[in-house]
Amino acid sequence: VPEPATTELSPVRLQELLLEHPALDGFLAALACDLAGHLAEWDVSGASITVVRPRRQTVHAGSGPGVSASGQSAADPASGVLTTGLPVVVRHLGGRMRQTAAPGAVPGADAAAFASVPVPVPLAGAGAGGAVLTVYSEHPGAFGPEAVQAVERAAAEAAAAVALALRLDALTHRAENLQAALESRTVVDLAAGIIMAQNNCSQQSAVDILRSVSNSRNVKVRDIAAGVVAVVSDRVSTHFEE
């Protein structure tokens, strides 16, 4: 991951990041690095972004290896931001607190201060989680009111790009699920056809046979179907036009 440098957070730059990093975690890591550079004048030495979504794994990415390890526990400042919707700022992070904190609670091993702010990204559904930008400094006393306001402005500027990245990730996830479902359906249909030919029965009767065997063996219908097809074919492929 490149070292943070003073970076202009322009719409064009955000579009470039989306095109260069199609995977959500890669985009968030690159964005965190740019945000750290964009906010360098406010004593920011690193940044991380945490995204919490319903029924999906929490995504956490940082501007460097030390930052990427943070955000993995309930003690992470992002948890407080998501709960209250308000910034969480610690200007003097003592050495004892760093030693006793849960793993991932401190955004960066050398952090002396940090600030976490919400990223205004609308996520559908009740209790849908949210996104949080956390920045940290190696200098105690960082992140006064003006600095926190600058971090909040940066989070607002990045919100549209984060929302688009989340939408693209959701569409990709849905497409992968649909493809898996279609592939599973192909195997079941082929197995049903084989059973129909062998037993001279209807399609529904063939499917019922597969389900009956599935229930008796406590094995998924798709796996039973794959076994039937394997008797007459070594490989089953499903073709998609994209």
Which positions does each model-derived feature cover?
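Regulatory sensory and allosteric helical modules in signal-transduction proteins
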Residues: 56-60, 66-112
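Regulatory loop-to-helix N-cap segments in sensory/regulatory domains
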Residues: 136-151
